[in-house]
Each structure stands twice: as structure tokens, then as C-alpha cells.
Amino acid sequence: SRRPARLSQPALEVLAIIAYYQPATRAYVDQIRGVDSSYTVSLLLERDLIEECGRLAVPGRPIQYRTTQTFLRSFGLSNLDELPELPNTTPEDGQLTLEMQAAVERLQAAQAAEGTEEVTEEELLQAAREMAQAEEEA
């Protein structure tokens, strides 16, 4: 069987946001990242790492997304409770801080250095911890 391709920086950012703040709308993801995430959300849907899980009861009824069993299997998790707790679970502003972007870049560099095709659970968790720490310091 073909090994899944490595996730890009935007895909890791979107996946981390949805994993920790689910159910999340694309507009919410866009607000946190500060850029349009339509393409990345569709890519994660194609890879079955996220799925639609209803609509938000506000005008326009935006689609909400959550992670899938494929996401859990890909990162060696039994359930979402195994994700480490984030110290601050409410982003204060609509942009990823430079520190958060740097955390994801370090994750990408570690992937490239190891020549791995998949993100390991520890890499995802480390990036999430660094993102949370950056949020707290912001």
C-alpha cells in the first residue's frame, strides 16, 4: 500500500486547529490563521483526516468539521482525550503568531531531516505544545 504523503505546513496548521477546537468552521480556522483555508480544508477532507459534522446555527449555516478515525489512526491515538491539554484553548487574536508559525516550521524541518513520509504523534504533539505556549505568551 502507498504511504501517505507528508502534510504541508498549512495542512498541519489547519489539522491542529480542527483537532483542538473541533467542531470548527472554515471561517474559524481562517480567523485563527489569518488566511483563506478553503483549499487546505478540501485537501484534508480528501485525505479523510477531517469530516463534516453538521452546521452551525447562525446565518449562512456554515459547515462544521471534526477529525476522523483516520486522523486518530494516522497519529497512533485511540481517542481525542489522548491529545495533550493545551494551556490556553482560546486563541486571543485572528492570526497565528510568529512563534506558532516557527513551531510548525520546526515540525516540517524535523520531518524532512528524518525523511519520514508521515507526521509522528510526537511531532504533532510537540508542535501543538509549542503553538499553545506561543498563544499563552501572545
What is the meaning of each model-derived region?
Residues 1-9, 32-33, 38:
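Basic, flexible Lys/Arg- and Gly-enriched helix-loop patches that mediate nucleic-acid binding at interfaces
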Residues 3-23:
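Short amphipathic alpha-helical interface segments
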Residues 21, 47-48:
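Alpha-helix C-caps/helix-loop-beta hinges
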Residues 21-32:
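Short acidic, hydrophobic short linear motifs in intrinsically disordered regions
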Residues 32-46, 59-62:
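Short amphipathic alpha-helical interaction segments
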Residues 48-57:
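A short, conserved structural fragment
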Residues 64-74:
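Basic, amphipathic "hinge/linker" alpha-helix immediately C-terminal to the N-terminal HTH DNA-binding motif
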Residues 73-138:
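Phosphate-centric recognition/catalysis
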